[in-house]
């Protein structure tokens, strides 16, 4: 269903091997920057920032309900279902709609892995639990879906954005701004620590970029056959 994307001018850019190596090196550099940034934030900024911003948004329960992960996942699933039905009835989708399907599926999968594996592995209590006496520390292999590290919201949003960042280069700046706004809201809303959103954004965007890269390689390979 997604092969029409390969013919779109927006999707050019797998490039020669040199470009792929450059992108890989940029990702490695980003990883090397993010790891110490997460460590420093976890040790020195998470708790002080959480205490400083506590209650700034007042009662954000309605906002939290409206943007709960289950709601966002349901919206993405509904979009995928609608576009699949459209593909069946019309025989094709525009490249942008195909990219949307890929972005939604990548986002859903990345969120599931984060919620069922990464949060369980790291086991960091969320800010609400910390304010009720929990220690802000890693509890390896002792976590649950209610833990906060990495941020599921940022993984969800980052994976969706990462696909479009790879397939539509002009979307990089606006999507980066939106991710930054989302990260700030998650911190100010007492849902996540600084380290949570950094780790979640990196993991999510990485998943999206990888999905876009693999799709481009698959599409270009299919077009040569």
Predicted regions and their residues:
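N-terminal transmembrane-helix/juxtamembrane module of multi-pass inner/ER membrane proteins
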Residues: 2-82, 119-141
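Structural signal for the C-terminal ends of transmembrane alpha-helices
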Residues: 10-15, 81-93, 165-168, 210-216
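Membrane-embedded catalytic cores of phosphoryl/pyrophosphoryl-handling enzymes
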Residues: 17-25, 29, 135-225
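Residue-level signature of transmembrane alpha-helical entry/exit and packing/kink sites
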Residues: 27-31, 95-103, 197
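Aromatic-anchored segments of alpha-helical transmembrane domains
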Residues: 36-43, 107-114, 179-191
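Alpha-helical membrane-inserting segments
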Residues: 41, 46, 81-84, 109, ...
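Transmembrane helix-loop junctions in multipass membrane proteins, especially transporters and channels
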Residues: 47, 51, 88-92, 123-128, ...
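Membrane-interface loops
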Residues: 51, 94-166, 170-171
């Amino acid at each position: 269903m997604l092969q029409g994307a390969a013919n779109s001018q927006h999707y050019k850019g797998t490039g020669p091997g040199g470009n792929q190596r450059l992108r890989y090196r940029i990702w490695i550099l980003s990883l090397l920057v993010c790891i110490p940034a997460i460590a420093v934030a976890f040790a020195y900024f998470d708790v002080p920032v959480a205490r400083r911003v506590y209650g700034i948004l007042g009662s954000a329960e309605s906002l939290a309900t409206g943007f709960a992960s289950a709601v966002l996942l349901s919206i993405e699933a509904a979009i995928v279902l609608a576009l699949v039905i459209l593909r069946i009835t019309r025989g094709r989708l525009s490249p942008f709609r195909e990219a949307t399907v890929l972005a939604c599926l990548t986002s859903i999968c990345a969120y599931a892995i984060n919620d069922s594996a990464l949060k369980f592995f790291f086991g960091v209590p969320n800010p609400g639990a910390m304010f009720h006496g929990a220690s802000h520390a890693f509890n390896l292999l002792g976590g649950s879906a209610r833990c906060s590290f990495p941020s599921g919201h940022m993984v969800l949003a980052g994976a969706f954005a990462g696909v479009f960042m790879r397939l539509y280069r002009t979307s990089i700046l606006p999507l980066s701004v939106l991710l930054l706004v989302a990260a700030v809201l998650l911190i100010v809303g007492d849902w996540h620590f600084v380290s949570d959103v950094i780790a979640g954004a990196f993991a999510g965007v990485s998943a999206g970029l990888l999905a876009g890269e693999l799709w481009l390689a698959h599409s270009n390979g299919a077009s040569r056959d």
